[in-house]
């Protein structure tokens, strides 16, 4: 049973956009973004436009289906979070027009290493201006790397927040905001130098 199935059974249109990371593909077999997830393993969503795994926010490829129609693999034309949000917003507008209830998931990989957001967001934070946690050891290379990574990480978070705002504005404009539940969560954080460690917590 997947989350899509009870919603579909209750009459909701279900959609998934973004990182899947459930098909068990290993990078040693090639770049995971080019692994095609077979339709039976796409969670039973009515619309599924995603990829198995990917760590290149400016080189993201999607494939999947909309209804019965298969969607061939294609490259997103801009930064992953912005492009995936564009897809979600288009979907919300379609659902608002047909009046049917819907359940949609947006699974954006950022914030994730490499910590590079669009320039307008990267420019908001400089490594020199980043405050480190008290548990980051006084080791020059650790502190330099932590500051550099956090500057990009913060830019990615602000970009994601801006995209959530775009979703909320679209829901309001379509009269759906008061009847829509938005659930936001993350699968992990990063250490950014805490106890001298980096990457996933």
Where are these regions (language model features)?
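Formylglycine-dependent sulfatase
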Residues: 1-201
């Amino acid at each position: 049973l997947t989350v899509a199935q009870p919603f579909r059974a209750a009459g909701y249109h279900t959609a998934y956009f973004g990182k899947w990371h459930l098909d068990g593909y290993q990078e040693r077999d090639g770049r995971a973004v080019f692994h095609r997830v077979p339709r039976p393993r796409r969670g039973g969503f009515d619309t599924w436009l995603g990829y198995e795994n990917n760590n290149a926010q400016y080189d993201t490829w999607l494939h999947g289906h909309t209804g019965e129609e298969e969607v061939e693999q294609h490259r997103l034309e801009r930064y992953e979070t912005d492009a995936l949000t564009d897809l979600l917003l288009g979907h919300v507008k379609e659902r608002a027009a047909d009046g049917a209830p819907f359940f949609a998931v947006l699974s954006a990989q950022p914030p994730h290493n490499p910590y590079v957001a669009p320039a307008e967001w990267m420019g908001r934070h400089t490594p020199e201006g980043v405050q480190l946690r008290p548990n980051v050891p006084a080791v020059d290379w650790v502190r330099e790397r932590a500051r550099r990574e956090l500057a990009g990480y913060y830019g990615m978070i602000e970009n994601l927040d801006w995209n959530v705002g775009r979703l909320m504005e679209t829901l309001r404009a379509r009269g759906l905001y008061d009847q829509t539940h938005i659930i936001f969560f993350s699968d992990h954080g990063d250490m950014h130098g805490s106890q001298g460690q980096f990457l996933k917590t």
